[in-house]
Amino acid sequence: MVKLFIGNLPREATEQEIRSLFEQYGKVLECDIIKNYGFVHIEDKTAAEDAIRNLHHYKLHGVNINVEASKNKSKASTKLHVGNISPTCTNQELRAKFEEYGPVIECDIVKDYAFVHMERAEDAVEAIRGLDNTEFQGKRMHVQLSTSRLRTAPGMGDQSGCYRCGKEGHWSKECPVDRTGRVADFTEQYNEQYGAVRTPYTMGYGESMYYNDAYGALDYYKRYRVRSYEAVAAAAAASAYNYAEQTMSHLPQVQSTGVTSHLNSTSVDPYDRHLLQNSGAAATSAAMAAAAATSSSYYGRDRSPLRRAAAVLPTVGEGYGYGPESELSQASAAARNSLYDMARYEREQYVDRARYSAF
């Protein structure tokens, strides 16, 4: 049986018309039309050759048709799967065994099985009949038609499709493309990969031009390196200073006259306590000014009568004293009462609180 391909068929053509046209040269087994092409199966090979010779470019309904042998003839029937092969068997020995039934195109052994490609389908059928379930090198091998279509290894498929490059016309073992997808020219690959040889390091360690190029440009890990304590402290101080400036920038700059003069004074301790002037105790304050110049600027606030009776204090240092009879004098008592009755501090609390809250 020979399968013929008919191309460029007109739309008016029918299967009966095509069948009757080819039956002039031999028995037609099957006729199929698919869109603008079709297939005709002729029983005799000689009749098929006559049909090709006479009907090629034949004008049918005003259109020249193409008649030729089908190129997509199934060659899967020529590929045989041979199982249970002896591990000592070689490709040459297996090929010679199958060549007893016809020409062998390719023979590939994969582990304990193999694929054998016969040139003709009838030879493949004869090989199956003669070699299936027969002894070969001490093992009973099984021969059958291969049904695999995916070419995942050499020998799995026909010559029309290479499993490496996907092109037709050659087997995988004859493919010029290597397994990496490049043309198998090892000299060219070697020159491309290893042709540029760098000069050796003739300088000392750390003085080579290659060393400087690699490690002397930028330090991408500088931010992750451990810094000294002094550097960390300086960075923290600068950050705190900047934060204080940003925080104080939005606060009001208004201050009272008393507070401004008190802060601007460089000779007076800002935390020193001074008695403020009061009209009700002007005479007493004048009397205490001379005593305050020779004594401490702070006033003792020991209000416990027990400790006050036992303590030995200066006579006029703190605004009160003891007489010859060790009794509290009336003048000292009056001065002491007037001192604690007046308002000692008259500062603006909001301005002071805003001044110290930033720190």
Curated annotation (Swiss-Prot):
Positions modified as Phosphoserine? 86, 304
Is Membrane a UniProt keyword of this protein? Answer: no
An example Pfam family from this entry, by short name, is zf-CCHC
A GO MF term: pre-mRNA intronic pyrimidine-rich binding
Q: Where is this region: Interaction with TNPO3?
A: 196-359
Q: What is its main location?
A: nucleus
GO CC terms of this entry: cytoplasm; cytoplasmic stress granule; nuclear speck; nucleolus; nucleoplasm; nucleus
The cross-link Glycyl lysine isopeptide (Lys-Gly) (interchain with G-Cter in SUMO2): at which residues?
Answer: 79
Q: Identify the InterPro entries for this entry.
A: Euk_RNA-bind_prot (IPR050502), Nucleotide-bd_a/b_plait_sf (IPR012677), RBD_domain_sf (IPR035979), RBM4_RRM1 (IPR034897), RBM4_RRM2 (IPR034898), RRM_dom (IPR000504), Znf_CCHC (IPR001878)
Q: Where found, per UniProt?
A: Nucleus; Nucleus, Nucleolus; Nucleus speckle; Cytoplasm
Q: How is it modified after translation?
A: Phosphorylated. Phosphorylated in vitro on Ser-304 by SRPK1. Phosphorylation on Ser-304 is induced upon cell stress signaling, which alters its subcellular localization and may modulate its activity on IRES-mediated mRNA translation. Phosphorylation on Ser-304 is induced upon cell muscle differentiation.
Start and end residues of each RRM domain: 2-72, 78-148
Q: Does the keyword Phosphoprotein apply?
A: yes
**SUPFAM superfamilies membership:** RNA-binding domain, RBD (SSF54928)
Keywords (A to Z) from UniProt: Activator, Cytoplasm, Differentiation, Isopeptide bond, Metal-binding, mRNA processing, mRNA splicing, Nucleus, Phosphoprotein, Repeat, RNA-binding, RNA-mediated gene silencing, Ubl conjugation, Zinc, Zinc-finger
Report the record's Gene Ontology biological process terms: cap-independent translational initiation; cell differentiation; circadian regulation of translation; entrainment of circadian clock by photoperiod; IRES-dependent translational initiation of linear mRNA; miRNA-mediated gene silencing by inhibition of translation; mRNA processing; negative regulation of translation
Zinc fingers (CCHC-type): give the ranges: 160-177
**Subunit (UniProt):** Interacts with TNPO3; the interaction mediates nuclear import of the protein and is disrupted by nuclear Ran bound to GTP. Interacts with EIF4G1 and WT1. Interacts with EIF4A1; the interaction is modulated under stress-induced conditions. Interacts with AGO1. Interacts with AGO2; the interaction occurs under both cell proliferation and differentiation conditions and in an RNA- and phosphorylation-independent manner. Interacts with DDX5; the interaction occurs in an RNA-independent manner.
This molecule's function is given as: RNA-binding factor involved in multiple aspects of cellular processes like alternative splicing of pre-mRNA and translation regulation. Modulates alternative 5'-splice site and exon selection. Acts as a muscle cell differentiation-promoting factor. Activates exon skipping of the PTB pre-mRNA during muscle cell differentiation. Antagonizes the activity of the splicing factor PTBP1 to modulate muscle cell-specific exon selection of alpha tropomyosin. Binds to intronic pyrimidine-rich sequence of the TPM1 and MAPT pre-mRNAs.
PANTHER family on file: HETEROGENEOUS NUCLEAR RIBONUCLEOPROTEIN M-RELATED (PTHR48025:SF26), OS02G0815200 PROTEIN (PTHR48025)
UniProt protein name: RNA-binding protein 4
Q: Gene encoding this polypeptide?
A: RBM4
